[in-house]
Swiss-Prot record:
Primary location class: membrane
Protein name: Phosphatidylinositol 4-phosphate 3-kinase C2 domain-containing subunit alpha
Free-text tissue specificity from the UniProt record: Expressed in brain (at protein level). Detected in podocytes.
Gene designation per UniProt: Pik3c2a
A GO CC annotation given for this chain: trans-Golgi network
Organism (species): Mus musculus (Mouse)
Disruption phenotype: Chronic renal failure and kidney lesions. Affects podocyte morphology and function.
Length: 1686
């Protein structure tokens, strides 16, 4: 016996006899009487038609029919009927109507037992087709569609491949086997069924002995006659029945509205009198229509003869009963078995929107126009955002010149000690009307307005008649204006001019004469905010595929195929085309295929295999009469294919609506007049159902065996509790592969405890297929599960409603799993993402999050002085820590408990908020109260509150309000971090977005930088949509002028990118030709436009200088692009354009270095850093500023051979070549010392690695700088298993040679050490700033910065917990370690070898000889008649070496000239001649190895003879060699030759040699006292003197006198062979009180350590400690004396 279980599934009872149930049945007599009356009426109508055409059913036909495999079995039999008849004796022509109906009701007519039984039995044709639900896994001939129209949502169905225990599945469990039992089977209902509204008696048993036969597509003529005979009843009724008011008004659509009386007591019954089963498909859904919103009378349908009789015989006053697809659900309880109770899914109103009906009442396919409009409906959140931006826009009217100047303002940086040395500068100002510029000297502290007044004095006699405010100073060569209210020296342009020692050129203009084409206009102010209007030119890496136009095309194609399928004779082929159209729609929707779509497609395939009904054109002599006299109330029998098509269309439109809502992030729950419940009162647990992942690639199917999800809930970047793992499942295949879980996930947290910013994370993992051999990774056998992708979803929407309904979440592959809370996932190309279907509960009310009420009148502030001393000390220690990183749990608890004691220390607020125990609603009132009484933070301190650790909207809004105090120029420096901080905003319309857009409205430089940063961020997988919206808002409010300029820049970047790609792909020999041809296209762009440089918008280019364009010989083959400045007063513009490398990391490193430089400048330390610009213009491409007059260290060193990196002089000699005078060289050396110190500190703090001589550059002015920051934060480049960067930073001996001015240490090296330590300590004070800046960049996707762990290097490098003195000692040791590292030189050497393939002669614009800046020819200088090495001289520079005097006599000259060359310069000449003339026989060069010292007189004398012989042989060689430009350049006189410097040095110039017993020099000490300890730091000693003039090995020894036992002896390490040692060592004396120390003296002695004799005294000093103020540090130089020492 079959019955309905409590979970609405059928169960087979063990007993064959059911227990009696107290229900009431219509007895047999009543039922037969009703049937007889109906048949009598039909017989009467039949007499009006022609006599039936008879035919015989042959035995062969019967056998063929019996031969079919029948997969369906009847569940119901009627024992009161006669026994089954054999078809062999039937004469169809003689059959009466009643006999035909009997055949129809005979379950065993012309059937026989099939060879194989189906998985699940199905109902017989006589069973009610209206209330029959097929199991999801069953196959049969009846179509899976509803008979007749309906207006409800289809219940949840599941693909047959993934059987699911649904609410009701045809009365049987899917796991129930088939049973060909002859015993009676009963259908019964549980007694406690809540939906059963009438009693039933025990049901009449059914005998499942037969089933409806499966029909072939083609039937024999004999069978066709029988079918025609049986169907004639329905045909007559169908074609002859007059239309009545009982017919529904809309019969054309696939789904129509049916009104069901809510008062009906009988909900679900099976009607057994289905008299025309062949004209209707069997229904696979049992659904109840419930429309509470519509109150009008229901419409009843009659779809078979028995229904027509029942409807016609009813009294007009009879109560209209509930109908399901035209079947009565109440009235007389006519039963053959107990009816089934079935509840359907909830209905959606949208079904009616896709139904239409023409005036004739015929059926038509839905157009879906109302649904398509949903794709154009703007997201509610986006609409609210547009309104907010429009309101913001009104605050910046175009008439306000302060916020809308139309030109760029020169950025300013405040410098300390600006009025020191060289405070006056020379200014040259171009004035209209004057032929020559006005030149005068002014103070750098003077305001720009004063400079303007000085310039106006040259053209106006009376300034009282002049409006000084209408004049501006424009930078020559740039569209950039100085700010009148700032001092001249604070502008970055002026600072760069002073740095490069170039002339300051300005132009005096009136405001009206200044180009203001970037200003907004009245039309711009009136234009509405449209986020998509100006994005059409933006290259979107992830294309939108769900727009109305493509969806409309797909739907049109689908409906066209449906119409063809319904009209064509060959429906099999047409249905295949329909299914293909459905597949295309699902493919366009990212491969999402809902269960209803899957089931509808299967039912359509089954329906097309059914025999088609007799068409309407059946010939009949009295057909028209028949139609006129048809019985009222009867309807067309439904076409099975039509019904299946209707349900398929419904499923497709449901899918489209779901996808549209998900794409627009719309809620699935209608708001309307629903009740609202506050979240803090909701005690329900958070739960949802993970249904499936759609669009799985075939690679995953072959590589992974199982899949599972990790579900986590986070807030403030941390999990609220342990993540939950789903079950492990495999993949399935319908249209596409999918992973199906259908699993309920319940989090152990109540909704009331959820913070507003709670984020759900779903991470997909794959378990590798151990048997898969197709994977290229052989190690997969040993690997664990792999993370395949991640997606995040905020639980409360922007209106603060809890999410509900079905969501499609876009999950990205493992290379993009850096998901951040609050992301609106960005859609990609079809099948490039995985779509995760998640179903949230849809309660009857909305849950909304409301903020707690804050009592602002309560002010609590505890005084820190009232705390106990130990608690106070601990609290101050935590407060004064530089960062909240590394706070322990105990520290956080302690800090939170004492938070009100910290109000006088505002900058500790981030630490306190990070220590909050939780952010539950119940605790927010206290937290917000603390926030609102907290003193304002400075902008840089408030920046930390924008990190992921602080997701609370109140906190972030307050932080942004404090940010308002930051200047535009400071904001421009931090803009990349602000752009990344947008990812931590939960909603689009945030205070941070409005803040950035407001600053962009008031400053063109910020708008320009923000544009390129947002454009580059469009490539972000998770946040591309958000950045697209912000970028659209920026372009919408920025004005037409700015948009047109940005469009031109983007076009220029695209053109240069194409050129760079072509050059990279070209072969080496054709690259230059390809470059020149490709640049012609770029040149054509400039013929139509002038264009601002994306790198620096103040630079405007008007054309290319194609002849100067080239490419660099490196892996990426970057372009050197030379452009002509549009300003005739400006210089050429040179930039590098690179394709194939990610420049975002370079941008970050350069930004950090620039911020460091500004910190140093504000503190008065100018390290003369070279800050060049870098901009990423797209994925793996960008533009870099070229620093003029600079070369790499490799180029400089290889001029001295491949081993040049092991030599000490190349850098010094290269600088001397470009700075020939002593004054110039001294200035260049000073620039080198300062810039080298800054580079050492910056590269160490940032952990910049992969440092070799090809990414360190030197300018001719002496400024050193680094390029190429592909490795940083300590991620070193590996050489095998060894780190290539073994030293803390690059400081080589050739650098030290320039710093010292020679081989021996001097006081200049002490200056270098002091500069390094001072710069290091200044950066250490800003540890929190740099950690915050880097932390905000974690979600940017940089390969070297992926997690908070990467910041550990920076924190350790900055040593935040040490004192300045300890940090000074620490960094001094780093300098010593770097200087003594042979690994750096070896790394340089290896790189020289690797770059040999790029070696050769320099290009025309490079010097041919290292010591000569230009190339000369004999045409200019005249031919040489005689040349010889005249003599040699000893020279000090500062080391001793010999220089050779070459005597030259030229044609046409009577007097010889002399040039001075070193032996190394002769050798360079020979080496380069060998390169130029590899096939010529050159004279041999005297380069034999010299043992011992080389710079001695004997060696010089021998070399003089050898070099003279070499020159004679060279001049007697071929004229091609002897008269080449290289030889001419070698003999061309230099500035040093003309001044005859360095030939002989006077005796007084010889290094000082002290007389016996002479003492000299000074020592620099730092003396401080704290915590009962005296600290003596020995820093430097300078100008030591020895008896014999040899370099000593100094060290320092100290005592605290009196000390008879010498227990206070302390000493430093020994510094070898130097008169100017640097120690920076701390000598500590512990356990001394201040009173005791005032009675002591510090005795310091400097001695030289000797190995073969006794150490000798170099000087000393005795310092009474009572003269020191021990409460502060004292740093001072002390002169050494000849005092006695212990």
């Amino acid at each position: 016996m079959a019955q309905i279980s409590n979970n609405s599934e059928f169960k087979q009872c063990s007993s064959s006899h059911p227990e009696p149930i107290r229900t009431k049945d219509v007895n047999k007599a009543e039922a037969l009487q009703m049937e007889a009356e109906a048949l009598a009426k039909l017989q009467k109508d039949r007499q009006m038609t022609d006599s039936p055409r008879g035919f015989e059913l042959s035995s062969s036909t019967r056998q063929r029919t019996q031969g079919f495999n029948k997969q369906d079995y009847d569940l119901m039999v009627f024992p009161e009927l006669d026994s089954q008849k054999r078809a062999v004796d039937i004469d169809v022509e003689k059959l009466t109507q009643a006999e035909l109906e009997k055949i129809l009701l005979d379950d065993n007519f012309e059937t026989r037992k099939p060879p194989a039984l189906p998985v699940t039995p199905v109902l017989s044709p006589s069973f009610s087709t209206q209330l029959y639900l097929r199991p999801s896994g069953q196959r049969g001939q009846w179509p899976p569609g509803l008979c007749g129209p309906s207006t409800y949502t289809l219940p949840s169905t599941y693909p047959s491949a993934y059987s699911k225990q649904a609410t009701f599945q045809n009365g049987f469990s899917p796991r129930m086997p088939t049973f060909p039992s002859t015993e009676s089977v009963y259908l019964r209902l549980p007694g406690q069924s809540p939906y059963f509204s009438y009693p039933l008696t025990p049901a009449t048993p059914f005998h499942p002995q037969g089933s409806l036969p499966v029909y072939r597509p083609l039937v024999s003529p004999d069978m066709a006659k029988l079918f025609e005979k049986i169907a004639s009843t329905s045909e007559f009724l169908k074609n002859g029945k007059a239309r009545t008011d009982l017919e529904i008004a809309n019969s054309k659509a696939s789904v129509c509205n049916l009104q069901i009386s809510p008062k009906s007591e009988d909900i679900n019954k099976f009607d057994w009198l289905d008299l025309d089963p062949l004209s209707k498909p069997k229904v696979d859904y049992v659904e109840v229509l419930e429309h509470e919103e519509e109150k009008k009378d229901p419409v009843l349908l009659a779809e078979d003869p028995w229904d027509a009789v029942l409807l016609e015989e009813r009294s007009p006053s009879c109560h209209l009963e509930r109908k399901v697809n035209g079947k009565s659900l109440s009235g007389a309880t006519v039963t053959r078995s107990q009816s089934l109770i079935i509840r359907t899914a909830q209905f959606t109103k949208a079904q009616g929107q896709v139904s239409q009906k023409d005036p004739n009442g015929t059926s038509s396919l839905p157009t879906g126009s109302s649904l398509l409009q949903e794709f154009e409906v703007q997201n509610d959140e986006v609409a609210a955002f547009c309104q907010s931006i429009m309101k913001l826009k009104t605050k910046f009217p175009y008439t306000d010149h302060c916020t809308n100047p139309g030109y760029l303002l020169s950025p300013v940086t405040v410098q300390r000690n600006m009025c020191g040395e060289n405070a006056s500068v020379k200014v040259s100002i171009e004035i209209e009307g004057l032929q020559l510029p006005v030149t005068f000297t002014c103070d750098v502290s003077s305001t720009v307005e004063i400079i303007i007044m000085q310039a106006l004095c040259w053209v106006h006699d009376d300034l009282n008649q002049v409006d000084v405010g209408s004049y501006i100073l424009k930078v020559c060569g740039q569209e950039e204006v100085l700010q009148n209210n700032h001092c001249l020296g604070s502008h970055e342009h002026i600072q760069n001019c002073r740095k490069w020692d170039t002339e300051i050129k300005l132009q005096l203009l009136t405001l009206s004469a200044m180009c203001q084409n970037l200003a907004r206009t009245a039309e711009d102010d009136e234009a509405p905010v449209d986020l998509n209007k100006y994005l059409y030119q933006i290259e979107k890496p992830y294309k939108e595929v769900m727009t109305r136009h493509p969806v409309e095309e797909l739907l049109d194609s689908y409906h066209y195929q449906v119409e063809l399928a319904l009209q064509t004779e060959n429906q099999h082929r047409a249905v295949d085309q329909v299914i293909k159209a459905v597949r295309k729609i699902c493919s366009a929707l990212d491969g999402v295929e809902t269960p209803s779509v899957t089931e509808a497609v299967k039912k359509l395939k089954r329906a097309v295999n059914l025999p088609r009904n007799k068409s309407a054109d059946v010939t009949s002599l009295s057909g028209s009469d028949t139609r006129k006299n048809s019985t009222k109330g009867s309807l067309n029998p439904e076409n099975p294919v039509q019904v299946s098509m209707d349900h398929l269309t419904t499923a497709i439109y449901d899918l489209l609506r779901l996808h549209a809502n998900s794409s627009r992030c719309s809620t699935a729950c209608p708001r309307g007049s629903r009740n609202i419940k506050e979240a803090w009162t909701a005690t329900e647990q958070l739960q949802f159902t993970v249904y499936a992942a759609h669009g799985i690639s075939s690679n995953w199917v072959s590589n992974y065996e199982k899949y599972y999800l990790i579900c986590s809930l986070s807030h403030n970047g941390k999990d609220l509790f342990k993540p939950i793992q789903s079950k492990k499942v495999g993949t399935y295949k319908n249209f596409f592969y999918l992973i199906k879980w259908d699993e309920l996930i319940i989090f152990p947290i109540q909704i009331s405890q959820l913070p507003l910013e709670s984020v759900l994370h779903l991470t997909l993992f794959g378990v590798l297929n151990q048997s898969s051999g197709s994977s290229p990774d052989s190690n997969k056998q040993r690997k664990g599960p792999e993370a395949l992708g991640k997606v995040s979803l905020t639980l409360f929407d922007f209106k603060r409603f809890l999410t509900c309904g079905t969501k499609l979440l876009y999950l990205w592959t493992s290379s993009h799993t850096n998901s951040i809370p609050g992301a609106i996932p960005k859609k990609s190309y079809v099948m490039e993402r995985i779509v995760l279907q998640v179903d949230f509960p849809s309660p009857a009310f909305d849950i909304i999050y409301t903020s707690p009420q804050i009592d602002r009148n309560i002010i609590q502030q505890d005084k820190l002085e009232t705390l106990e001393s130990d608690i106070k000390g601990k609290l101050l220690d935590i407060i004064h820590r530089d960062s909240s990183f590394g706070l322990s749990k105990e520290d956080k608890v302690f800090l939170w408990e004492n938070r009100y004691y910290c109000l006088k220390h505002p900058n500790c607020l981030p630490k306190i908020l990070a220590s909050a125990p939780n952010w539950k609603w119940a605790n927010l009132a206290k937290t917000y109260s603390l926030l609102h009484q907290w003193p304002p933070l400075c902008p840089l301190a408030a920046l930390e509150l924008l990190d992921a650790k602080f997701a609370d909207q109140e906190v972030r809004s307050l932080a942004v309000s404090w940010m308002e105090a930051i200047s535009d120029d400071e904001l421009a420096d931090l803009l990349p971090q602000f752009v990344q901080a947008l990812k931590y905003e939960i909603y689009l319309n945030s205070s941070l977005v409005r803040f950035l857009l407001s600053r962009a409205l008031g400053n063109i430089q910020i708008a320009h930088s923000l544009y390129w940063l947002l454009k580059d961020a469009l490539h972000d997988t998770h946040f591309g949509s958000r950045y697209e919206h912000v970028l659209g808002a920026l372009l919408s409010v920025g004005g037409k002028g700015l948009r047109e300029e940005l469009s031109k820049q983007m076009k220029l970047v695209q053109l240069l990118g194409g050129v760079a790609e072509k050059v990279r792909q070209a072969s080496g020999s054709t690259r230059q030709v390809v470059l020149q041809k490709s640049m012609e296209r770029v040149q054509s762009f400039f013929l139509r436009n002038k264009c601002r440089l994306p790198l620096k918008p103040s630079l405007v280019a008007k054309e290319l200088n194609i002849k100067s364009c080239s490419f660099f010989s490196s892996n990426a083959m970057p372009l050197k692009v030379t452009m002509v400045n549009a300003d005739p007063l400006g210089e050429e513009i040179n930039v590098m354009f690179k394709v194939g490398e990610d420049l975002r990391q370079d941008m970050l490193a350069l930004q950090m270095i620039k911020i460091m430089d500004k910190i140093w400048l504000k503190e008065g330390l100018d390290l003369r850093m070279v800050i060049f610009r870098c901009l990423s213009t797209g994925r793996d491409r960008g533009m870099v500023e070229l620093v003029p007059a600079s070369d790499t260290l490799r180029k400089i060193q290889v001029e001295y051979g491949v081993t040049g990196s092991f030599k000490d002089k190349p850098l010094a000699e290269w600088l001397r070549k470009y700075n020939p005078s002593e004054e110039e060289y001294e200035k260049a050396s000073e620039n080198f010392i300062y810039s080298c110190a800054g580079c050492c500190v910056a590269t160490y703090v940032l952990g910049i690695c992969d440092r070799h001589n090809d990414n360190i550059m030197l300018r001719s002015t002496g400024h050193m700088f680094h390029i190429d920051f592909g490795k940083f934060l300590g991620h070193a480049q590996m050489f095998g298993s060894f780190k290539r960067d073994r030293a803390p930073f690059v400081l080589t001996s050739d650098m030290a040679y320039v710093i010292n001015g020679g081989e021996k240490p001097t006081i200049r090296f002490q200056l270098f050490v002091d500069l390094c330590c001072q710069a290091y300590n200044l950066i250490r004070k800003q540890t929190n700033l740099f950690l915050n800046l880097l932390s905000l960049m974690i979600p940017s996707g940089l390969p070297e910065l992926t997690s908070i762990q990467d910041l550990k290097y920076v924190r350790d490098a900055l040593q935040p917990q040490t004192t300045d003195a300890e940090a000074t000692i620490f960094f001094t040791r780093l300098i010593e370690s770097s200087l003594g590292s042979i690994a750096t030189k070896f790394n340089f050497f290896i790189h020289n070898l690797a770059q040999l393939r790029f070696s050769g002669l320099p290009s025309n614009d490079e010097p041919i000889l290292s010591f000569s800046p230009k190339t000369y020819s004999f045409r200019q200088d005249g031919r040489i008649k005689e040349v010889s090495v005249f003599t040699y001289h000893k020279k000090y520079n500062p080391d001793k070496h010999y220089i050779y005097v070459v005597r030259i006599l030229r044609e046409g000259h009577l007097e010889p000239s002399f040039v001075f060359r070193t032996f190394d310069e002769f050798q360079e000449l020979h080496n380069k001649l060998s390169i130029i003339f590899p096939l010529w026989k050159l004279p041999g060069f005297p380069n034999r190895m010299v043992l011992g010292r080389t710079h001695i007189k004997d060696v010089a004398a021998k070399r003089k003879i050898e070099l003279n012989s070499y020159l004679q042989s060279l001049m007697n060689a071929s004229t091609d060699v002897a008269e080449c430009d290289l030889v001419c350049t070698f003999f061309h006189p230099l500035l040093r030759d003309e001044k005859a410097e360095g030939i002989a040095r006077s005796a007084g110039a010889v290094p000082f040699s002290p007389t016996l017993g002479q003492i000299g020099g000074a020592v620099k000490l730092s003396v401080s006292y704290r915590n009962g300890t005296l600290f003596i730091m020995v820093m430097h000693i300078k100008d030591l003197v020895t008896e014999d003039g040899a370099d000593p090995n100094p060290y320092v020894k100290t005592y605290l006198l009196p000390d008879t036992h010498k227990t206070s002896k302390r000493k430093t390490k020994i510094s070898r062979k130097t008169r100017n040692p640097t120690f920076n060592e701390m000598l500590v004396y512990s356990g001394y009180s201040k009173e005791t120390l005032r009675q002591r003296e510090l005795q310091l002695s400097v001695l030289s350590a000797e190995s073969l004799r006794e150490n000798f005294f170099l000087g000393g000093i005795t310092l009474p400690l009572k003269d020191f103020n021990l409460s502060k540090e004292t740093v001072k130089w002390y002169q050494l004396t000849a005092a006695t020492y212990l």
